[in-house]
Amino acid sequence: MQLRHIGDSVNHRVIQEHLAQEVGDVLAPFVALVFVRGQVLLRFFWNNHLL
């Protein structure tokens, strides 16, 4: 009985980690895009001495 409970909790944790990894894989390109756009915007303001 205890072993089945331990197996169920391990399986639940693996599923949660897999979902978290999928969310990270989906969000990574968007985060990179925002970071690059932020750099471009800061460079534009810096070059035009607006900062």
UniProtKB/Swiss-Prot annotation:
It comes from the Eukaryota. It is found in: Peroxisome. A motif (Microbody targeting signal) lies at residues 48-51. Keywords: Peroxisome. GO terms for cellular component: nucleus; peroxisome. GO terms for biological process: positive regulation of apoptotic process; spermatogenesis. Testis-specific. This is Peroxisomal testis-specific protein 1.
